[in-house]
Amino acid sequence: MKHVFIINPNAGKHDSRQRIYDMAEALREKHGQEVQCILTKNQGHATELARKLCQTGDDLRFYACGGDGTVNEVANGVIGYDNAAMTVIPVG
C-alpha cells in the first residue's frame, strides 16, 4: 500500500507541515511503507492529484492535511475508487 500525504501549504502553521513530514518519514523508516508527500498548488489540485493516483489501480491510503477545503477536495478525488482509503490530519 502506498501512503500519500496531500498537504495544503497555506493551512495551519509552518511547524504543522514539519510534523506531517515527520509522520511520513516514520512510516517510511520504521514500517517500510511507500510514502509520498505532495503540496497542493491551487484550488482543485487535491482532487486532481487524488483522482489521477486512484486511476493507477494501486492500493492507496490518502492523508488529507489541511482544513475543510482540502478534506473535501481529496474526498471528491477518491470517491468511487475501491483501491483508496482516506483519513484526515487537521491542520487548517
List each language-model region with its residue ranges.
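ATP/NTP phosphate-donor binding region
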Residues: 1-62
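N-terminal glycine-rich "phosphate-gripper" loop used for MgATP/nucleotide binding
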Residues: 64-69, 78
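Short amphipathic alpha-helical segments
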Residues: 17-19, 75-78
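Short glycine/serine/threonine-rich phosphate/pyrophosphate-binding segments
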Residues: 46, 69-74
